[in-house]
Design a protein with these regions (language model features):
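Cytosolic ends of transmembrane helices, especially the final helix of ABC transmembrane type-1 domains
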Residues: 1-14
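ATP-binding Walker
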Residues: 70
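ABC-family ATPase nucleotide-binding domain "signature/switch" substructure
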Residues: 74, 107, 112, 120-123, ...
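Conserved H-loop
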Residues: 147-154
Length: 253
């Protein structure tokens, strides 16, 4: 655990965030997060998102679909507070919220995941604050379908890994998913976070995630993701083309 604190310092050196006034967050809970007429552009370029209207309710599992370049990742980073809006309104339970506050609500898992030199445990605890419950650690690893892989390693959670070796691309992605599940943020965004998994492994991971009572958004291009969500949002050219409920065998709150 002590070694993980050192690894956390490494993470802070890698993820450099612009200085900003820290927003006052009421609590890490919400009923709905709403984007109304939100647009985004990079500098003087053409809008990459145009007049987005999207309301996310607590406990929903949403698939954000669309072709490459449709604006899925840009919207995901807007939802995560990493990009700022050029126009429109963002509210949390009908109160205005800034991107600094929004960032505290969301854990974002990108498609390209990274492994830092250190142990499996250190990598799992990067960015994690507070005491780690062993049962919770084992549970999230099982949900991410990475526990068996870890247990087969020479030293288990104390096995040394690095970006250049030790883990396959799929294992890196599942490790990142487990790390996200350890976080306390109520909204999890997975941006093509299962793209490196074979269909059987992806199906197991998605089925596990669908049962977890947290709000999740999956940016994906595989139609197989649809069977694990309650709602499908389709994007075309920076706009939401459709937003409809999806049949889902699971129940959410």
């Amino acid at each position: 655990i002590q070694q993980a604190k050192v690894a956390n310092n490494r993470l802070q050196e890698v993820y450099v965030v612009d200085k900003e006034e820290k927003g006052k967050l009421k609590e890490l809970s919400f009923k709905q997060l709403a984007f109304k007429g939100v647009s985004h552009r990079f500098s003087y370029q053409q809008e990459t998102l145009s007049k987005i209207d999207l309301t996310i309710y607590k406990g929903e599992k949403i698939a954000l679909m669309g072709k490459s370049g449709s604006g899925k990742t840009t919207l995901a980073k807007m939802l995560s507070g990493y990009y700022t809006k050029s126009s429109g309104h963002v509210t949390l339970d009908k109160d205005a919220i800034g991107h600094a506050e929004l960032r505290q609500m969301v854990t974002y898992v990108p498609q390209q995941t990274y492994v830092f030199t250190g142990t499996i445990l250190e990598n799992l605890l990067l960015g994690f604050e507070g005491e780690v419950d062993e049962k919770k650690l084992l549970k999230v690893c099982q949900q991410a379908d990475i526990l068996e892989d870890i247990q087969k390693m020479p030293l288990g959670f104390q096995t040394q890994v690095s970006e250049d070796g030790g883990l396959s691309g799929g294992q890196k992605q599942r490790l990142a998913i487990a790390r996200a599940l350890l976080s306390k943020q109520p909204i999890l965004i997975f941006d093509e976070a299962t793209s490196g998994l074979d269909s059987d492994t992806e199906s197991r991971v998605m089925a596990n995630l669908a049962k977890i009572k947290r709000t999740m958004i999956f940016i994906a291009h595989r139609n197989s993701v649809r069977q694990h969500v309650s709602r499908v949002v389709t994007m075309v050219s920076g706009q939401i083309e459709s937003d409809s409920p999806n049949f889902n065998p699971f129940q959410f709150i």
